[in-house]
Amino acid sequence: MDQEVMDFFDFSKEFKREAAPQGYISSDPSIMATETNESKVPKREVIGTDYVPEIVAKEKCLLDRTLRDDCPQSKRNRTLDDLDTDDEGEETEIRRDDEYYKRYRFNLNRDKNLPIYAKREEILAAINAHPVVILKGQTGCGKTTQVPQYILDEGYKSGKYCNIVVTQPRRIAAISIANRVCQEREWQQDTVCSYQVGLHRPTSLEDTRLLYCTTGVLLNNLINKKTLTHYTHIVLDEVHERDQDMDFLLIVVRRLLATNSRHVKIILMSATIDARELADYFTTTNSVPPVITASHGRKHAIEKFYRDQMGSIRWKEEEDDQLVPQINDHGYRAAVKIIMVIDNMEREAAIQSRLSYDEALRYGAVLIFLPGIDEIDTMAENITSMLQSDRNIKVFIVRCFSLMTPENQRDVFHPPPPGFRKIILTTNIAESSITVPDVSYVIDFCLTKVLVTDTATSFSSLRLTWASKANCRQRAGRVGRLRSGRVYRMVNKSFYQREMAEFGIPEMLRMPLQNSVLRAKELEMGSPIEILALALSPPNLSDIQNTILLLKEVGALFLTVDGVYNAMDGDITYWGTIMSRLPLDTRLSRLIILGYVFNLLEEAIIIAAGLSMRGLYVNEGRRTQGADSFWMHYIFADGSGSDLVAIWRVYLTYLNMVEIAHEQESAIRWAKRFHVSLRSLKEMHLLVQELRWRCTNLGLIPFAVNPSQMMGDREKSIILKVIIAGAFYPNYFTRSKESCAEPDRNIYQTISGHDPCRTVYFTNFKPAYMGELYTRRIKELFQEARIPPENIDVTFQQGSQKVFVTFKQDDWLADSSKFVSVSGRVQSEVYKAVRMRLDRIQRPIRIMTQNNFMNYVQQRGIGDVIEGRWIPPTKPLNVELLALPSVFSKTITGLITCIISCGKFFFQPQSFAECIRNMSEIFNAPQQLRNYVINAGAITKGMMVLAKRDSNFQRATVIRPENQSNRQPMFYVRFIDYGDCALLSMQQLRLMPKELIQQYGDLPPRVFECRLAHVQPSSVVSGNNRWPTAANDLLKSVAKCGRIDIEVYSLFNNVAAVLIPMKDGIINDMLVELKLSRRSDEDYMSRKDHDFRLRRQESARYLTLTERQQINEEYLRSCQLPQDLDLPPPPLDKCNTIVMLKGPSSPLECSMQSIIRVGSSKRVNIDNASVNAVLLDADPQDHHDHLIVAHATVESTNGQTLTARGTTLMPNVQGFGALMVMLFCPTMQLKCNNEGTSYVSILAGLGCDPVTGEPYYAEHDVLINLDVNILEDDVVLINQIRYYIDSVFFNFKEEKDPAVSINERVSIYTQLRSLINRLLCKDRSYMQRNMSNSDFEWESNPELPMPNEPFGKRAIFPMHSLTELQEEDMGRLMHLRENCSMLHKWRNFEGTLPHMTCKLCNQLLESVPQLRLHLLTVLHRDREKQIDYCNQ
């Protein structure tokens, strides 16, 4: 790297001092500043549409002036102040096309039976006479296919050139209609008639005269060319849908029609259109668009009934409830009653007429319109439950919604089974997209769900609202196809007529405006406000302003216009240009941009396409999902904790199944097995291809990397998560733990000392129920989660209503959980168990009454009954025989016999060497090895055998047989006295003689399990809490040295946390220095045991040998948890009482909190379909922040709850949240403590007004109170990364495209990889948290040095400045050291501790045990090092 670049990032060099805004961040919910009047987000003023009339009036004058002017002007000005016409490229003479018409066959016979044909001449005359024509024709009248043909036929007759484009709102419609026209006219596809949708486009449009395309395709084409003159006729179909593309297309068409395309004809068509509004929109002084209506006479009558006309239905709601958009229980029951009335009516009609009841059933399907999937499920439950009382009515219920599978979709059209009536429960998808001929009845609740976005917060919410009359009319049109029909509207007629709106709310008034604003910038015909004011329904001025702020936040717009800050506008960046040309949300486009920067473009494209799709998974969006369906998400996520990674892996698997295998049947089987939707994946595949094509056209092309420089899987995973964090900033959340003085102590108290990473619990099981007899029944509850009973231990605590369920931790057990990988220490079974509770909160279990129970256990001799109280049987335990380290032993000498990883290895104390030799001699005596295994059936699970280890036989336990049927039987065994496992054949096993079993069967293992203390695997180097190979190899090299010493830190769950001294230091510390691990806190029980051991070892010299032995036995006995007795339960016919267990629950369950200002006080949920829906503290020993990034955030209707969707759990790296905010925020202030000696928080966002200090975008300001030390060199690294990201796309204003060569990109890519690795691998010391009520205030500091800006005001990521830290005051240092010394003195105090505070860590200490354990935390030990304190 050039020295100039390095000097630029050197903060020791002199800076030019200028006034500059600063920044600050916070990611821990428990320490965020409390919400005060100062920190609350000021309510942004809603500014309406008062700005519109002036701009519209100016536009009207322009239109009138232009249309009056016969002489075209030569220049076109691109502002509203002075717009002229430009007829370059516009034909003033009539263009002939006779040769073209001779090449193709033109059959002029049109279908005269279509209702539109009657209006043919009127339509053509109007088109010839007017620039704009409005055609209103009901669905099925033929307008979409016939009107363009009428125009083309006229061109053929006259020989005039014709080029017609017809827009459709959906791709499938454009394709199918174009194909239908080609078939009707017998034209070859992609000749006279063609279509263009995304990637589906003809290789050449030279011969195309009739083009069907999506609205977006035409819009982008017109924005790029800025003229309509490439077409003679533009037909805008389905104008009533009023999506943003259509509304913006109307703006562009009207503007270009007035400026440079006056001879182009515009035809607007729709079935349900507000013709007057459209006519007014295109009216000028000299021209009023004519409105032509084409009716569609129905063959069968439709009767409409309203709620107040249904006298036989007894409505129970209050009058006021009828005005609220909702469906209550009475509404559901009323719908079922209507179904009953319909059935009775048809039975009576069958008696009086020739139409049989069975025939009426076949054509008498009922279509019920409901607002969402949840309401569909509730309606189905009500129909099923209410009709159980009437066995004469048989119904076949079909659900119909946008995410349904193709199989379910076919059920909608198939006839019901004989004797059944088909009931279709549908959302508004059946309004127009699906037509079912056999529907004779519609029950319409007149409701719909509308997605509304608050532009100030960018939160979206799905709101239940009344449908428009236009919607209801379309719904009513679903009946009367084969016979007369009835429509039942579940509202009063007066309410329908007076209160319900005629049309729905246009997208431009309720959806994000980012793409429209960017298109306005690309159009270059005025500011976004001037352009959007011309919309058919102009948005509020405040919505445009908020959108511009959001676009500045994502890097689409600069803060300034021509170098001057403008709150209502901003120059478009090259990022903004890319975003405007990709058919995606701006944040998904940002994902692709960052993917290009880090050369992970393909991954970014796949994820962006997947996030744009709905329904990749079957049952997505349902209230409950099957266990198998939900856990497929985890399989695809592969321990990443990311819905986005899961999407990427689903797609890659799909490609492998479809493109490589080329077997449709295998793909279908795969989709069913993994509960994914092939239809959605096919649509996603098309979008992926389109995005690749668009990126190539934009110059976004990945480059080949030398194989030696390719990313490894782990590095790729980390970089991908960094990209995700950058793309979706500031949709950041943190996992929040229980807010109490000792949250980790509460975890273990909740589960009575069990391992929280393997244990869940039920409640509501009273001690009187004698739970030990029902352990197998409790294990059976987990069958729905596919957890085998043999992997479960069930225990109880005396006097408690809790049932503890612990999952065995054994990598060798055959279990489907192996396929489910999760990050952190928590076992996947815990996630499965908690998920069970989320689906159903109570679990029934059948038990006996107490009297019957006592008789039962006494008759069978199960345990003892003493004084009317049952004592369960117990397993004998001789703790003095255990090989566990004594409480008085600090250092133990011995051998490491087996290494699975640095987190699990086995140690054999030297004191057992002679015992091991003796046993080996006995086991390998010839007379003991005669019992060969002849029959594989003689080997059973859990059986003790003699197994060959190296050259000798040792005692071993059979784990399980190998699941191989086509070769000789083999068995997995564990060597009891060494800890290792092996797969052995029958020839390598011997049955153990009875005398050996009697002698050694109950002897505990002569090894104990260990793990390295104070360290855990580095998330940057290895994932899923797995230790990297290099770390394990280092430990193995130590083990090969033979006898070593280990230092026992603690003992918990019979696992010793140890330190291993070496010549060059402790191996635990060496792994941290080699960046193979990172420092971590020991969890609560480990620190508690360590404190107990320390105090016992300090008192050992005062105790006799006998006393020490007695204390050690008591200690080891206290370390043993209750054991699962696994007693057979009583027969079910004797269990007449049902107990509802509540759970399972985990003490590690945690919630989330948003770190942006507007969301910090709201409750946060995770989408039920996310892999993070079960959110646990996967590393409970860590007390630093864990960051979660969401693709989108949805707000509840009441505004109190946020739901995070498309979530990704970020790597467990200290300070990761703070680093990502600093890396990807527009600007920030790094705030110091009062003494100015350390950085304590970060405030990030768009910054503030340098004069008033008011934040530009207060709602999205981000605050993180730091829990690790951020130093000056961290900011240097971050500035370098920001510089390199900017350099990829930098261009001067007059330049069209960036001018970065491939070689420069490769160099930037290499530098970015190195810098990211250095940033994330750094071992950062912990620090105490600081809070302030002024955390959200942007501070003004004229003395702050402002770094030179290499890209000036055209930087998307400007350089961060920071305040220089001060040296710690000596007086304060002495004060802190005195406080430390005092705490250590109180450590051995046995009485009641007066409340005191650790001033190093800002921690209140209320008891001596709490003080002792606090002194052992990494935070406190780091702080002691920082002040150079040494405890004497």
UniProtKB/Swiss-Prot annotation:
It is found in: Cytoplasm. Keywords: ATP-binding, Cytoplasm, Developmental protein, Differentiation, Helicase, Hydrolase, Meiosis, Nucleotide-binding, Oogenesis, RNA-mediated gene silencing, Spermatogenesis. ATP binds at G137, Q138, T139, G140, C141, G142, K143, T144. One of its GO terms (molecular function) is ATP binding. GO terms for cellular component: nucleus; P granule. It is an enzyme of class 3 (hydrolase). CDD domains: DEXHc_TDRD9, SF2_C_RHA. GO terms for biological process: dorsal appendage formation; germarium-derived oocyte fate determination; global gene silencing by mRNA cleavage; heterochromatin formation; intracellular mRNA localization; mitotic chromosome condensation; oocyte karyosome formation; oocyte localization involved in germarium-derived egg chamber formation. Residues 936-999 form the Tudor domain. It catalyses: ATP + H2O = ADP + phosphate + H(+). Its main location: cytoplasm. InterPro entries: DEAD/DEAH_box_helicase_dom, Helicase-assoc_dom, Helicase_ATP-bd, Helicase_C-like, P-loop_NTPase, SNase_OB-fold_sf, Tudor, Znf_C2H2_type. Residues 124-291 form the Helicase ATP-binding domain. Its EC number is 3.6.4.13. Residues 337-524 form the Helicase C-terminal domain. A motif (DEAH box) lies at residues 237-240. Probable ATP-binding RNA helicase which plays a central role during spermatogenesis and oogenesis by repressing transposable elements and preventing their mobilization, which is essential for the germline integrity. Acts via the piRNA metabolic process, which mediates the repression of transposable elements during meiosis by forming complexes composed of piRNAs and Piwi and govern the methylation and subsequent repression of transposons. Involved in the repression of LTR retrotransposon copia. Belongs to the DEAD box helicase family. DEAH subfamily. This is Probable ATP-dependent RNA helicase spindle-E. The lineage of its organism: Eukaryota, Metazoa, Ecdysozoa, Arthropoda, Hexapoda.
